[in-house]
Amino acid sequence: MNFENLLIELGTEELPPKALRKLAESFLANFTEELTKADLAFKSAVWYAAPRRLALNITELAIAQADKIVEKRGPAVSSAFDAGGKPTKAAEGWARGNGITVDQAERLVTDKGEWLVYNAKVEGVETKSLVAAMAQRALDKLPIPKPMRWGSSKTQFIRPVHTATMLLGSELIEGELLGIKSARNIRGHRFMGTGFELDHADNYLTLLKEKGKVIADYESRKALIKADAEKAAAKIGGTADIEDALLEEVTSLVEWPVVLTASFEEKFLSVPSEALVYTMKGDQKYFPVFDDAGKLLPNFIFVANIESKDPAQIISGNEKVVRPRLADAEFFFNTDKKHTLESRLPSLETVLFQQQLGTLKDKVTRISALAAFIAEQTGANAVDAARAGLLSKTDLMTNMVMEFTDTQGTMGMHYARLDGETEAVALAMEEQYKPKFSGDTVPTAAVSCAVALADKLDTLVGIFGIGQAPKGAADPFALRRAAIGVLRIIVENKLPLDLVTLIAKAQELHGANLSNANASEEVLEFLMARFRAWYQDKGINVDVILAVLARRPTRPADFDSRINAVSHFRGLEASSALAAANKRVSNILAKVEGELPSSVNVALLSEAAEQALAAKLAELQPQLAPLFANADYQQALTLLASLRESVDQFFEDVMVMADDAALRNNRLALLNNLREQFLHVADISLLQ
């Protein structure tokens, strides 16, 4: 079979930078799915993307589908011929429909009978006649929330489309994409490049770079920007802050990246660096530069989309653009310093947190009390926790945070230090919002943990308490993130906290605000569900999670210890046999009516196997008790794994449901005792 390389390019107006990668990846995934459905073999497939184009390159694509043999079954032989052996009308009609005579048909014999059959050869369709329709279907399935129309056309896409190119090797594939006829013309850089006609699919990247002044390979463009930015920073003795999200956005904004270095007045360094970095990265898409000590330098690196004969002019222009933003930050900072955070408390009364839950002033009052309560249980400074909780939202009323919203908490920390608050209070101002996103770190300082937990629990209990739990994908108060935050803070810091106690205290502090009588139970269930999702994301087997959840441990740190212990136990050789035995025990005990017998009478142990099991349990229990008390569940389950032989022998030799009631109840008590030892950790009968 012959192969050729396929090139598809869509020339557009500027595509949304934050959506560019997803659009290109989805286009590729959709198109390769079409190829697979069409039984078109190919070696590899890659996507290219730049601000004004999406492209695919499929290497060694079959130029046609493979020929197929299609079995066309006809009537049964018994009904295909009459008594004289002549073909019936049914047989002749079937043969005529397939373009053959009855004599040309073959016979198919199965265990159900014999049929006429025709193995028809179906020639494969040429790839060039399939590509346009497949590409259009791939484009139709792109994740575009708000498509637009342009000109007089009714065609819709994320941005207006001007060119479409489909080449199979050197052959132009006829057809249309989004109403644009396929042609060889490729547009270059808007200012630097020239348009050209593409002669062969293999020359796309090279000609586009040489003639069009466009680096279409997204990953190459990204790597070039990163390398050049790092070199530029090193030249001025610094290190560029190149966050991947910002690097992705910048890569999606330029076709021909030119990395340049600019500077700003050193006087602006008196402003907390986070505010300066926020405006450089968030507003201007610049890369800040830091020295070896992590101190911000009065420089930044930016990426131009053009090679200029006078780069100094471009640098000067960017410096002029950023200067007013930095001056604003300086003004806000100097103005905010004139007022303490404490003096801003009354202004929180003017901001509503939630209609039924009161103002931000009401919220910080609750946070303060709950943070102090948590601090007392964890050994943190309760006075600092209460103070940090009270001030926790005051920086929201500052000019700086109102203008640069992402600096909330961080600016609170700086202002708290200027106000003379303790370092624990200042740090808690910043860390209260952690973790902000998946993979973010959690606070580790004791006071910070107390305040972060108090804030999240106050929101969780409050919103559930007024009957506004998240439904479906909607989660306006980010309760799922808050719940994961609560669990992570407690688990990762190994805090001795009980969710039931925390929820009850938060509910108490809300007082009469809450109308949902089941709020505490619903919040606990919500947190438990987050536990399951969190551990699944970490790769823990679902049966392990369910085994622990069955015991309903409400101390997250304890829950985590059980998860780790059961995961370890699951890897032991004895685990599957003991899990099966526990399942058998549970089934037996579930059928017992009334109260289960609890004490074992050694004198009634008549069988050797039950005597051995009872003796083994009696031997282990003194060793297990301190392990359970100290939550050393892994060692406890390792000890319990030694019961395997005794348990197996018991079920092999002993009739549990004996006719003698005394014997039966004694054996049930023994099994109940066995199960209880495992239930100190988890219900291992749920392990698969």
Curated annotation (Swiss-Prot):
Gene Ontology cellular component annotations, sorted alphabetically: cytosol
Organism encoding this protein: Shewanella oneidensis (strain ATCC 700550 / JCM 31522 / CIP 106686 / LMG 19005 / NCIMB 14063 / MR-1)
HAMAP family linked: Gly_tRNA_synth_beta
InterPro entries: DALR_anticod-bd, Gly-tRNA-synth_bsu, Gly-tRNA-synth_heterodimer
Complexes and interactors: Tetramer of two alpha and two beta subunits.
Protein family according to the UniProt entry: Belongs to the class-II aminoacyl-tRNA synthetase family.
An individual GO BP term: glycyl-tRNA aminoacylation
Name the record gives this protein: Glycine--tRNA ligase beta subunit
UniProt main location, coarse: cytoplasm
Keyword vocabulary terms for this entry: Aminoacyl-tRNA synthetase, ATP-binding, Cytoplasm, Ligase, Nucleotide-binding, Protein biosynthesis
Subcellular location: Cytoplasm
Catalytic reaction list: tRNA(Gly) + glycine + ATP = glycyl-tRNA(Gly) + AMP + diphosphate
One Gene Ontology term of the molecular function aspect: arginine-tRNA ligase activity
PANTHER family: GLYCINE--TRNA LIGASE, CHLOROPLASTIC_MITOCHONDRIAL 2, GLYCYL-TRNA SYNTHETASE
Known EC number: 6.1.1.14
